[in-house]
Amino acid sequence: MDANLWLWVGQILLALAFLSVAYGHALGFEAWSVRPGFGWMTAVGRNNMRVIGGLELLGSVGLILPAVTGVLLWLTPVAATCLAVLMALSVIFHARRHGEGASIVLNLILGLIAILVAYGRFVVAPL
């Protein structure tokens, strides 16, 4: 398979992953913060979680919409880069808290995929 196809797979996986949590982070603070494994949300705070959820939503849209519409194609690798930075910051946050290893692993995986998509769309197979 060619690089373009693999990059699309990465873009779609990232978009789905971030879309699946963006709503809960942005608007479902009360419901999500009491779930097991999501206690960290109270440490971040409601307003900060809204910002994070909004960034996740924008990143998800930025991974797919420019390529589908053919407009502002440079936004796709920029969105992937921004999501990679968000995941790096998330890893740092969770590393400072005890017992959140699963969050660290997930954020590392998503961050790695985002880095690969960013590099791929900037260098290997630009849109």
Which functions belong to the PLM regions below?
Residues M1-L127:
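Membrane-interface extramembranous regions
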